[in-house]
Amino acid sequence: MAKQKIRIRLKAYDHRVIDQSAEKIVETAKRSGADVSGPIPLPTEKSVYTIIRAVHMYKDSREQFEQRTHKRLIDIVNPTPKTVDALMGLNLPSGVDIEIKL
């Protein structure tokens, strides 16, 4: 029989929030009796935006903004029905994007 696996990808702009969420997920999965691999930190996406400070002229005066997207990967191997129920009832912060693949 093939092993079942749940793959959870987390994305957030704040690394503290994503680490707390990952720890909650890992703790919940381990408590329910599943094997957990992770959280694995994936490369951080960095988007840099450059704008001109003045409205009409002074092209040499520019300002740069950046937006970092932190990502984590968690694999849950051999999940039990209890694991799935516990993960569905888990409350996570609103700043975390969760993508689950079975």
Swiss-Prot record:
Does Chloroplast show up as a keyword for this record?
A: no
Q: Can you name one GO molecular function term for this protein?
A: tRNA binding
SUPFAM superfamilies given for it? Ribosomal protein S10 (SSF54999)
What are the entry keywords? Ribonucleoprotein, Ribosomal protein
Question: Which residues does UniProt call coiled coil?
Answer: none
What disulfide bonds does the UniProt entry report for this chain?
Answer: none
**SMART domains (alphabetical):** Ribosomal_S10
Q: Which family does it belong to?
A: Belongs to the universal ribosomal protein uS10 family.
Query: What does the function comment of this entry state?
Result: Involved in the binding of tRNA to the ribosomes.
Which HAMAP family would you find in this protein's record?
Ribosomal_uS10 (MF_00508)
State how it assembles: Part of the 30S ribosomal subunit.
Query: What protein am I looking at?
Result: Small ribosomal subunit protein uS10
What is the name of the gene encoding this protein? rpsJ
